[in-house]
Amino acid sequence: MSKEKFERTKPHVNVGTIGHVDHGKTTLTAAITTVLAKTYGGSARAFDQIDNAPEEKARGITINTSHVEYDTPTRHYAHVDCPGHADYVKNMITGAAQMDGAILVVAATDGPMPQTREHILLGRQVGVPFIIVFMNKCDMVDDEELLELVEMEVRELLSAYDFPGDDLPVVRGSALKALEGEAEWEAKIIELAGYLDSYIPEPERAIDKPFLLPIEDVFSISGRGTVVTGRVERGIVKVGEEVEIVGIKDTVKSTCTGVEMFRKLLDEGRAGENVGVLLRGIKREDIERGQVLAKPGSIKPHTQFDSEVYILSKDEGGRHTPFFKGYRPQFYFRTTDVTGTIELPEGVEMVMPGDNVNMKVTLIHPIAMDDGLRFAIREGGRTVGAGVVAKVIA
């Protein structure tokens, strides 16, 4: 039987498993690849292939993550699974594996546990938009009422963190039994895959979002004007369109009078491309690295925000000592460092290397930002932490 070849035309969706240690995240990941490969074609991945997660670096932080891929009839999924709790925290905060949706695994034998709560909170803070629940190990629970109780607890916990706990899908299954090929439990994996397809909307592609280009360099070309260079993060900029220069200084409007790539002139610059954009009426000294070029009105400059951060441990090349309130590091956004002060939550006196913490940050210059923007925390050019803007304040 010939397998159909992988079609690039299918929408691509990023998902991942989250949840408490030993609740079966990796077993479920293996079960999904195995059952879907058997049902729709594709390749299965064994538990130990997934559990042996390779190290990767994101924003100077080493994270162990496993990536698997699988297909449903309508979509192609890239799925991330992490072996340890600390890897999840780092992964979610750095955005190393951006998730369009997550599968929260809860063992029916235990119900929600401390890391279940922490992963849900992190999901809320870092902007995981959709959660589907897989209640695992249901083959080990005979009492229907107990299953009802666990499901209710999980739904209430999700609602407490502003997810639609009453409405989101919950699948009761057994990853291990599905992996062993028991039809009744394999059907639950197919049911879960159906919810991935129907409950997680197709993500908006970067190219369809409003134009944004983080400025890396500025040149002036005699007789032509000022050119800014950088990689288009999202959207499209066309010659003749109005753009705004946002961040650090007051916002200024200009017009794009040319786009070039590899010294060739283009009509437009698109998401993912490294381009030079020629700006009308802008002096070389009016614009600097760290600002962004954006579609007018699409992004505002801010100095104050609530954030979720991970502080590197000593072994990861981070600080050797804790820090306290009044700590003033640099916050590296996109292409530049900005000094900021921090405020710790009530009852938190100090932050140790290896901790993750919620903190309020006030920057000395405004930066173009939206909720979900990633940043690094640096001291003299050395990365000591990573963070994400949970909520813009001012």
From Swiss-Prot:
InterPro entries reported in the protein's UniProt record: EF-Tu_GTP-bd, EF-Tu_GTPase, EFTu-like_2, EFTU_2, G_TR_CS, P-loop_NTPase, Small_GTP-bd, T_Tr_GTP-bd_dom
Annotated region (G1), positions in chain: 19-26
Keywords: Cytoplasm, Elongation factor, GTP-binding, Hydrolase, Magnesium, Metal-binding, Nucleotide-binding, Protein biosynthesis
Main subcellular localisation: cytoplasm
Gene Ontology, cellular component aspect: cytosol
SUPFAM superfamilies reported in the protein's UniProt record: EF-Tu/eEF-1alpha/eIF2-gamma C-terminal domain, P-loop containing nucleoside triphosphate hydrolases, Translation proteins
Chain spans, region G2: 60-64
Residue numbers spanned by region G4: 136-139
Enzyme Commission numbers on file: 3.6.5.3
Location of the protein in the cell: Cytoplasm
Superkingdom, natural source: Bacteria
UniProt: Mg(2+) binding residues: T26
Xref: Pfam families: GTP_EFTU, GTP_EFTU_D2, GTP_EFTU_D3
Record-annotated tr-type G domain positions: 10-204
Binding site for GTP: 19-26, 81-85, 136-139
Catalysed transformations (reactions): GTP + H2O = GDP + phosphate + H(+)
Top EC class for this record: hydrolase
Region described as G5: spans on this chain: 174-176
Signal peptide location: none
GO MF term set: GTP binding; GTPase activity; guanosine tetraphosphate binding; translation elongation factor activity
Region of interest called G3, as start-end residue ranges on this chain: 81-84
Family under the similarity heading: Belongs to the TRAFAC class translation factor GTPase superfamily. Classic translation factor GTPase family. EF-Tu/EF-1A subfamily.
Subunit structure: Monomer.
Known function: GTP hydrolase that promotes the GTP-dependent binding of aminoacyl-tRNA to the A-site of ribosomes during protein biosynthesis.
Name the UniProt record assigns to this protein: Elongation factor Tu 1
